[in-house]
Amino acid sequence: MTGLWIQPTGAALAADVHGVDLSQPVNDEVFARIAEAWAEHLVLRFSGQKLDDRMLMQFSARFGELDRVPISAASLDRADSDVIDEAREWVAVIASVKKDGKAIGSLGNYELVWHTDMSYNELPPRASLLYSLEVPAHGGNTGFLNMYCLLYTSPSPRD
């Protein structure tokens, strides 16, 4: 067993995961502990990881079959983009960076409104993984909501 340990944030959800290098294949025993922590805490943060797209895809696939990135599946015009790598079918790049005048990702400097990833699908994905390479000093926050707490603490419609 590795030195894997889980540190709850103390908030309504989330925990930090320490002692695992996601750039390497994660064995079944370690993944079982990660999956258990995810079921308990709903959001897991793995700080200090150095991953490329393939590594991210490999770890993500442990949670289930990967879904195509909506923008690449529906509307990405490859002739207008540097996005030619097969990984772009599975890994969404959200960036304001341009290379040779072409965006390397989607959304640019725009903020997303509050949403649940791909909730418009009849069978939404089991999980979403976010890997940040560069985050601004101010802003760039990602929020999470514990819908179980909302469900169990909200008044009944009959109240």
Region locations from a protein language model:
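Non-heme Fe(II)-dependent double-stranded beta-helix
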Residues: 2-142
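Conserved small/polar residues in nucleotide/adenosyl-binding loops
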Residues: 152-159
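Flexible glycine-rich active-site/ligand-binding loops centered on an Asp-His dyad
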Residues: 146-150
